[in-house]
């Protein structure tokens, strides 16, 4: 028989065991996070899962890197496109060195003393003259000319073929003639391929009077015009720098026999005619100009030697309506050497810009003289770096870039049609950006 005392302790034992079992169950649940006690909420001890869950939601937003990066990439693309929009109108302006192209302007002609395109818009060619083809033929190759166009924005190349002097056309044998004509042909083709104009220059110098080799000139230009009559980009310069005792009457007599040879084949080609005193005397031409269409008269200057008086000669002729082409110039002295005269060079450039004159700087070579555009210790013939250029080469390159930049900034020079086109493209760009950001579409 069980006593009361035994019953009492049996009940106590059962209760203790129950407490232990229940406590163990709750303890395990608490550790797993399955149970939250009321007093825990008051002390801020939230359930582990409730703390972790918002963190998981936040992670989902920040982990999607393409979405967060896409607007940044779109901004970059937008900026790049805007740069293209700024550069594009430069091709619509006449003064921009990089804007004049054969494809855009086509065949040129002279109208009221100004070089113009087919629609009568003034055209300003900015170019480089070679040195003598017999001395430095490596600078008039396809690679060299393409480099000038792509890296410098040059749109005309002048091919200086000496008539006398070293391996001149008129003093060498047939092999010399053939080599020079091959040089010209490669350069003309390269200029055409690169959307440029090209000047074939009958480069008299020590022969002084163009009449000395007039028969050779007639034969040469007859051959050239028949070969290139379909090339709208070819310009003929029939006598570089008449000098010594040669007068305008002498030059006019020569021109009246050579120009018809070209005109018999090509009615419209631009023909450049040299003037007395190393192509610096325009006054005598004003009194008695040639009676042909599409004729321009050459004027040469070197900033280190020719200053205000020479500029007055040029501007007076221009004001009188004489069509002038600066087929050769330099920023150094007239002997082709010395340092750049920056003060006078800037004044000359102002005249060129004001009258929208076409010009070719002398000379593309690495000859050890101030007028060479390439440093004498540089053996490259294309893709020049800035440090590969001479003092004049660097000055010229900087000038080209400043002209290009200033024209880009002159929004007022753009036609209303061009402005409207630019604004329309910018609006389309902004709309595209909004759509890309909202839809996160893949850009083309």
Residue ranges and their predicted role:
Residues 1-51:
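Gram-positive cell-envelope targeting signals
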Residues 35-101, 416, 420, 424-428, ...:
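N-terminal, intrinsically disordered, polar/charged segments of Gram-positive cell-envelope systems
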Residues 36-44, 83-156:
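N-terminal carbohydrate-binding accessory modules
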Residues 106-108, 132, 137, 197, ...:
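Extracellular glycoside hydrolase catalytic/binding regions
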Residues 119, 123-144, 163-178, 334-337, ...:
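Acidic/histidine-rich helix-loop elements
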Residues 141-205, 214-219, 263-265, 341-355:
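Aromatic-lined substrate-binding rim segments of carbohydrate-active enzymes
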Residues 163, 205-206, 331, 366:
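Conserved beta-strand edge residues that scaffold enzyme active sites
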Residues 397-412, 416-421, 425-444:
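Short, low-complexity, Pro/Ser/Thr/Gly-rich segments in the mature regions of secreted, periplasmic
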């Amino acid at each position: 028989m069980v006593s009361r005392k035994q019953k009492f302790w049996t009940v106590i034992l059962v209760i203790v065991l129950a407490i232990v079992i229940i406590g163990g169950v709750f303890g395990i649940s608490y550790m797993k996070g399955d149970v939250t006690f009321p007093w825990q909420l008051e002390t801020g001890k939230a359930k582990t899962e409730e703390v972790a869950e918002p963190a998981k939601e936040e992670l989902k937003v920040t982990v999607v890197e393409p979405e967060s990066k896409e607007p940044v990439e779109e901004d970059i693309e937008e900026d790049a496109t805007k740069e293209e929009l700024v550069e594009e109108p430069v091709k619509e302006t006449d003064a921009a060195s990089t804007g004049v192209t054969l494809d855009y302007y086509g065949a040129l002609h002279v109208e009221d003393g100004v070089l113009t395109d087919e629609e009568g818009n003034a055209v300003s060619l900015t170019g480089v003259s070679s040195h003598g083809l017999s001395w430095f033929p490596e600078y008039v190759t396809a690679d060299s000319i393409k480099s000038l166009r792509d890296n410098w924005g040059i749109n005309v190349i002048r091919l200086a073929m000496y008539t006398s002097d070293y391996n001149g056309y008129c003093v060498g044998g047939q092999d010399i003639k053939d080599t020079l004509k091959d040089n010209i042909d490669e350069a003309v083709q390269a200029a055409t391929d690169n959307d440029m104009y090209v000047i074939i220059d009958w480069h008299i110098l020590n022969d002084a009077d163009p009449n000395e080799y007039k028969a050779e000139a007639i034969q040469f230009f007859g051959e050239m015009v028949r070969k290139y009559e379909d090339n709208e980009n070819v310009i003929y310069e029939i006598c570089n720098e008449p000098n010594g005792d040669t007068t305008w009457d002498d030059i006019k007599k020569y021109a009246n026999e050579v120009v018809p040879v070209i005109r018999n084949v090509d009615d419209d080609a631009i023909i450049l005619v040299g003037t007395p005193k190393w192509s610096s005397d325009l006054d005598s031409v004003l009194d008695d100009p040639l009676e042909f269409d599409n004729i321009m008269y050459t004027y040469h200057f070197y900033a280190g030697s020719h200053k205000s008086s020479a500029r007055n000669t040029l501007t007076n002729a221009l004001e009188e309506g004489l069509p002038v082409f600066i087929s050769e110039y330099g920023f150094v002295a007239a002997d082709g050497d010395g340092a750049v005269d920056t003060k006078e060079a800037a004044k000359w450039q102002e005249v060129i810009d004001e009258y929208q004159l076409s010009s070719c700087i002398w000379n593309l070579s690495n000859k050890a003289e101030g007028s060479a555009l390439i440093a004498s210790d540089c053996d490259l013939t294309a893709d020049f770096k800035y440090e590969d250029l001479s003092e004049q080469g660097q000055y010229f390159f900087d000038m080209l870039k400043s002209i290009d930049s200033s024209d880009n900034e002159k929004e007022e020079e753009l036609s209303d049609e061009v402005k409207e086109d630019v604004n329309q493209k910018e609006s389309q760009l902004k709309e595209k950006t909004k759509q890309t950001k909202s839809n996160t579409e893949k850009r083309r």
